[in-house]
Amino acid sequence: MKISKKRLMFPLLLAAAAAIVSGCSSLLSGDPDGSSSESAELTVFAAASLTEALEEIAEEYQKAEPDVSLIFNFDSSGTLKTQIQEGAVCDLFLSASPKQMDQLETESDSLLPESRIDLLENQVVLVTPKENEKNVDSFDSLAEHLKAGDILLAMGNSDVPAGQYAEKILSWYGLDMRELESKGLVTYGSNVKEVTAQVSEGSADAGIIYSTDAFSAGLPALDRASEEMCGKVVYPASVLKSSGHQKEAQDFLDFLSGPKAQAVFERIGFSMAE
């Protein structure tokens, strides 16, 4: 019996079409049996002082998790907190102070329950340009120069954690911020990187920044603020409740707590939170 080629090809074409549709469905649905998996794009909001550390850690993480893309938004913790509250897409937030994280938790219920951790600790330090024309060598001498009115200090503004720590230090010495401002003795940066740049470029006589930023900029830390002067400098981190990639965000946060990331953090000057 002779079989028509047309009659034979029709069911074969149907079978081929079904296989293609099935394969496409598997890929679109992220089926583990599909030929490839869907990649995740994580948006990480992080304090500006974490820039160098996270960029280096990201390279290591991409080797371990090639299907996860990391997009960083570095700025002051106060600015990032406001962006999150205004609806910006963010999967993971790393703040330079508990204050901004607390506000996200209490004011807008933005944090994924039980994902928040204290990740790192830093130190607040005094730096000057390499010339150090004012011969500042300690917070004590900085305070004396400010009282004498013969120095320009760079610090973060009031919604930047680095600025808030600086204000505590100046208050500890009995200095009044309004008086310092009225005499033109302070200049502000919108984040700690701007403050660091002002000192590095010599546009300010001294600056109050983090130990890690001093290290990255090659500026010697002339003095370190005690916990009594400004409190403990803790960096909390949390997955956001609104994240579309909560598992991947938690996985990256776990990696940041692990030994490979720890080695990078500690080399730059951070310590892991207790």
Regions found by a protein language model. Name each.
Residues 59-72:
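Signal peptide-proximal N-terminal region
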Residues 74-81, 90-104:
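Ligand-binding clamshell of periplasmic/extracellular solute-binding protein-like
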Residues 24-59, 78, 85, 97-98, ...:
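Exported/periplasmic ABC-transporter solute-binding proteins
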